[in-house]
Amino acid sequence: MLNAKNRLRKRKEFGYIYKKGTKIYGQHLCIFFVPSKISAPKIGISVANKVGHAVVRNKLKRQIRHIMREFVPAIKNINLVIMIYPEIVGTTYENLKQNIQKTLQKGKIISE
């Protein structure tokens, strides 16, 4: 689970990142990010209603929060939103982790 200081919660924050942020496309996901004035990164997760039932969506969000917890120390001064596409349903945890890591590296959010 992400710490409270590392979570995006407000609709206004999500909207700002969608509007002003840079997009990075990965396999089955898209990451929007903007530079932040605060040193601690803030992370939001967006899973559309088209992605399975509520149980499936919540499981994906829990897995992504757990994965991002490992990457938080490497991320500096960035707020980001991870948007999940419906095709991701059925992928393994390890595959999801690799997809997120590759996408973060592609956008130079974390180093390789």
Identify the function of each model-found stretch.
Residues M1-E112:
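Positively charged, solvent-exposed patches that mediate nucleic-acid binding
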